[in-house]
């Protein structure tokens, strides 16, 4: 299919491309990192459910941290929750933040014009290893393909009991951690979550796959202290 390249950047993780094409008469926005497709605006149901399910698990999620900005659908879904008073979004790639600051994407304006939004250029995984300077009611994370398929080898230690314990220190009491994954629920990771959090649940989110004509699924893990 013919596409328009909206941005191209060399990054430490590879060539990052934002492009737009038409599918069934509508604009579709896609992100590629090297040869891998990271995300498409055709498939955002599970990204939005990451916010909905994560915030629903908390009684009063005033302060939210989103790990991974991407096309912005998780962040904007979080802002739709009136209980959220502030939302910090962390992304390791300044180009991605720039796309939204330039309002290149469908949800960019709603995201950057909301006074509750703060966009931060930082490595989310490195941030979780540091002593917390701020704590949050909910952490919503969508960066890697899954717990076993990371975009960078440096992310792997996050998906361990030690990594999850360090992350949990950034949560307030009764705080919630929610994670998107492209894979089915993984019992080994569910067991790790259960060692760190008081309650855990794995949600399988189904959505129509307009390319295959079938139904696809993602997983949203939700865990609460």
Functional labels for PLM-detected ranges:
Residues 174-181:
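Conserved beta-strand signature within the Rossmann-like core of class I S-adenosyl-L-methionine
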Residues 25-39:
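A short, structured beta-strand/loop element
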Residues 40-43, 190:
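A short, polar/proline- and glycine-enriched secondary-structure boundary/capping micro-motif
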Residues 1-29:
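N-terminal auxiliary segments of SAM/dcSAM-dependent transferases
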Residues 183-225:
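Class I S-adenosyl-L-methionine
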Residues 3, 16, 125, 205-206, ...:
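Glycine-rich, charged/polar anion/phosphate-binding loops
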Residues 44-173, 196-206, 214:
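The AdoMet/dcAdoMet-binding core of the Class I SAM-like
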